Amino acid sequence: MLRSGLASLIVDVNLRRTLRPSPTFSFPAHLSRCIITSRYSSRTSLRFPIQISRHQHRLSYFSSSSSSEQSRPTSSSRNSFSGHGQLDSDDNSSPPPSQSSSKVLTLPTVLTLGRVAAVPLLVATFYVDSWWGTTATTSIFIAAAITDWLDGYLARKMRLGSAFGAFLDPVADKLMVAATLILLCTKPIQVAELGPLPWLLTVPSIAIIGREITMSAVREWAASQNGKLLEAVAVNNLGKWKTATQMTALTILLASRDSNVGWLVASGAGLLYVSAGLSVWSLAVYMRKIWKVLMK
């Protein structure tokens, strides 16, 4: 009787030590205590069934709460790398991975490559002195202008934007516009009262091409600086109006270069001067924004 009473006292003391919550939780030590407690409880289960079952219930509660605290993500683990290989953060300003494509030859990029490949065809058909040469040149330029809008729309709508496409798109636009301007300057426009005027299209062409070269260099420099400079050179509504008038003017001039319709040629030349003025104006606006950022 004395030995059995002493054994029950030892079991009760061990159970109380086990059930006492410790400030620092150690999983191996806690596991060893559970094993020892289960051994003692199996020996004394016939004498103290109610007390042991109650202690085991409390023991399982503390074990589950401790393991849940260990499995709960801490503040340091919230900033760990996610499954996509990107650092998780609370900033929602960055686009989700599905908005950009890892493929190089997406549909918008193929359309952009088609514009680059159309530049030699534009040059070849421009020097064909016939009506179908004029029609082919104008059709190629119109198709390039349409795909310029279409590839950007598809990249946003279908989430097929890529870094290669973002680099190639402005290059294709500048190649097409610069080639068309140079081609038009090689064949002076005939004005009935004044005869050929070789400078009529040369002046706005120099302004437009010079502006595009300057903005390309400025954007390349801004990309290597802070984010505020990139915001300063972002495309604005003035640049969109410049592009619209530029494409319209070049289409009219290509379609009417062998035509005797004076007002059509004059309207195309007038729109080209408007486009040149908008180009210089937008360049001044960009430079003013950049100057404000640099002076802060």
Curated annotation (Swiss-Prot):
| Cofactor(s) of this protein | Mn(2+)
* Keywords (A to Z) from UniProt: Chloroplast, Lipid biosynthesis, Lipid metabolism, Membrane, Mitochondrion, Phospholipid biosynthesis, Phospholipid metabolism, Plastid, Transferase, Transit peptide, Transmembrane, Transmembrane helix
Low complexity composition bias: residue spans:
62-82
Region (Disordered): which ranges?
Answer: 62-103
> From which domain of life does this come?
Eukaryota
Q: What class of enzyme is it?
A: transferase
The regions listed as transmembrane in this protein's record are 104-124, 126-146, 164-184, 189-209, 261-281
The metabolic or biological pathway listed in the UniProt record of this protein is: Phospholipid metabolism; phosphatidylglycerol biosynthesis; phosphatidylglycerol from CDP-diacylglycerol: step 1/2
Q: What membrane topology does this protein have? A: Multi-pass membrane protein
Name the family the entry cites.
Belongs to the CDP-alcohol phosphatidyltransferase class-I family.
NCBIfam families on file: pgsA (TIGR00560)
Give the function comment from the record: Catalyzes the committed step to the synthesis of the acidic phospholipids, including phosphatidylglycerol (PG). Transfers specifically a phosphatidyl group from CDP-diacylglycerol to glycerol-3-phosphate to form phosphatidylglycerophosphate. Cannot catalyze the phosphatidyl group transfer to inositol, serine, choline or phosphatidylglycerol. Possesses high activity with CDP-dipalmitoylglycerol and low activity with CDP-dioleoylglycerol.
Q: What is this protein called?
A: CDP-diacylglycerol--glycerol-3-phosphate 3-phosphatidyltransferase 1, chloroplastic/mitochondrial
